[in-house]
Regions:
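Structural helix-adjacent loops and short alpha-helical linkers that scaffold large soluble proteins
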Residues: 127-137, 234-241, 413-420, 436
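Long, intrinsically disordered, low-complexity segments
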Residues: 21-22, 54, 78, 82, ...
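Flexible, polar/acidic helix-loop-strand segments at domain edges
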Residues: 324-398
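Bacterial Sec-dependent N-terminal signal peptides
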Residues: 1-32
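A glycine-rich, coil/turn loop motif that links secondary-structure elements
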Residues: 132-138, 208-220, 438-439
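An aromatic- and glycine-enriched ligand-binding surface/loop that stacks and positions planar moieties
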Residues: 23-86, 156-164, 188, 192-197, ...
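Conserved, well-structured interaction surfaces
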Residues: 47, 51, 55-56, 83-155, ...
Length: 534
């Protein structure tokens, strides 16, 4: 299969990317895209348009650091190395002209939306097979909803700012500069509707040929619809029923499509498990191109073996959120004194070979598997350390999140102690090696969600704190890390001290619940209004 990257009818010439299979290297080959008059003629044209949906995954500002600068505001993470603009974001002092790489997300998602609208505008009237037509229309609905779901939680609200401008295949060209809807609920309703349409048209995952692994399917559409409904429920509790409905569709799948929790959390995030029973939807890459996020998570400099960037590091608050015996803690966070293998070398963290290069004294290890082998560079990770693409899928939603979303909807809509919510949370706890003793309280749900999903690109701990109404209190507390003192004879760690590494911050829930829309987007629009307070 050739996976060509096509940037929409508005851009007629682009470097194409072809992907022969999910594990093979990407081949780069240029092609000139004819104008729209000559383009929408054949199934091959449609396939090129569908392949173009994946172009955003290769942008460092989108799937590298991108929205992680906003997640860096949470109490799970601190900026792992000096970065003034990042500190402004974390301290809720950013301007509309800042945003670091995150500002690239807004235009990238509207480009994705435009591509989806091109398909929805042109494909229905084409003389092609119904199978190809359904595939194309289903994927277009999926990626249009996907684009809005990437933006809505970070930039939209139910007042005073409103939602994200809605542009569909029916929006006249003269009216593309749409004003914002009065509420972000208009976006969430559209996302749910689009994902419903996608689910109706797309195949089940089991029906995908292996060369199409990574493309949308029914369960992925339903899962993102559930996430949109969960985010909408902070404004209107009726959406909790929608969350439960979509989660049940996934939970009740049978046969080859039945989803489950992969038994060993410590080995979940490995290439061989990219499409295990826990998979719902990820963005794929390889050693030539793809998402770069994983390489941002290890300490700066990669122990002299690979130039990882070290921008996001775990807090002691996150480390302590895990209960004693929780296997997720040591599978997520590398603590001084523990060992990992990195590019074939045994790293006794904090002791050899180059100590600790992290603000918090710890580093994330959740996504380190692609870097373990001595032969990893050029095979499982990009040889260019400024482009840390790798073979591990960048998880955006997995089955554990589906269980947690349903449990949350049950607790918030039917009350703490809900029997079904207990069972769902205990499934999560059992896999983590913990007693199955959840009482399904709101506090327990929040902590299970924090520990299970820590540092995954989506969903966002910061957005969770905002929608729960917990952000102001959480961010009023300082954050902590650790300082390691080695024995004078060089034989190991003498002692570890807890230290404050980030001062308390002022979070104004009337302003900081959303981020400023990039000033470049405001300046090129007559109708787009800035979020208040920025």
């Amino acid at each position: 299969m050739k996976l060509h990257i096509y940037k929409g009818i508005c851009s007629f010439f682009l470097l194409a990317v072809s992907l022969s299979s999910c594990q093979d290297f990407l081949e780069f080959e240029p092609y000139g895209l004819e104008g729209s008059v000559n383009f929408w003629k054949t199934e091959n044209d449609v396939q090129k348009a569908l392949n173009a949906f994946h172009e955003f995954t290769y942008k460092e500002g989108v799937t590298g650091r991108g929205l992680m600068w906003f997640e860096n505001c949470s109490d799970n993470i601190v900026t792992g190395r000096p970065q003034a603009e990042a500190d402004q974001i974390k301290n809720f002092q950013m301007s509309a002209g800042n945003g670091r790489d995150a500002k690239e997300t807004w235009p990238a998602m509207f480009q994705l939306n435009a591509k989806a609208n091109d398909v929805l505008r042109n494909v229905p009237g084409m003389a092609i097979s119904e199978e190809m037509k359904n595939k194309a229309i289903g994927q277009a609905h999926f990626y249009r909803a996907f684009a809005y779901l990437w933006l809505a939680p970070f930039y939209g609200d139910n007042g005073p700012n409103g939602g994200i401008p809605i542009i569909t295949e029916n929006t006249p060209t003269a009216e593309l500069d749409q004003p914002r809807p009065s509420s972000v609920l208009a976006n969430y309703d559209m996302i749910i509707q689009d994902m419903e349409e996608a689910g109706n048209l797309l195949p089940y995952f089991s029906q995908l040929p292996s060369e199409d692994y990574g493309r949308p399917h029914k369960a992925a559409a339903w899962a993102f619809a559930a996430r949109a409904a969960l985010y909408a429920a902070q404004y209107d509790a009726k959406y909790y029923n929608t969350v439960i409905d979509y989660c049940d569709r996934i939970i009740n799948l049978t046969g080859e499509d039945k989803r489950g929790l992969y038994p060993d959390f410590s080995r979940l995030f490995r290439q061989e498990n990219n499409f295990c029973e826990e998979y719902v939807f990820s963005l794929l890459g390889n050693a030539i191109e793809g998402p770069k996020f994983h390489g941002m998570s290890f300490q700066n400099g990669g122990w002299g073996l690979y130039n990882t960037w070290g921008y996001f590091q775990p807090t002691l608050e996150l480390y302590k959120a895990y209960e004693k015996g929780d296997v997720r803690r040591d599978a997520t966070i590398l603590y001084p004194g523990n060992h990992i293998t990195f590019v074939g070398e045994d790293i006794h963290f904090g002791v050899n070979p180059s100590g600790i290069s992290s603000t918090s004294g710890m580093t994330f290890r959740k996504f380190i598997s692609s870097w373990e082998s001595r032969n990893s560079i050029g095979n499982t990770v990009n040889p260019n350390s400024n482009n840390s693409s790798n073979v591990l899928g960048m998880v955006l939603i997995r089955y554990a999140d589906v269980l947690l979303m349903k449990a949350e909807a049950l607790i918030w809509s039917q009350g703490e102690g809900n029997t079904e919510a207990k069972a769902l949370l205990n499934r999560i706890r059992k896999r983590a090696g913990l007693p199955e003793n959840s009482q399904a309280t709101k506090a327990q749900l929040k902590n299970e969600r924090r520990c299970e999903l820590a540092f995954e690109f989506q969903p966002s701990r910061h957005i969770d704190l905002v929608r729960w109404g917990d952000a102001q209190q959480a961010y009023s507390k300082p954050l902590h890390g650790i300082k390691v003192t080695l024995r004078t004879d060089g034989t190991g760690i003498d002692h570890i001290d807890e230290i404050e590494i980030w001062a308390s911050r002022t979070f104004n829930p009337k302003v900081h619940h959303v981020f400023p829309i990039p000033s470049t987007e405001i300046s090129r629009s007559k109708n787009l209004t800035q979020n208040k307070g920025y």
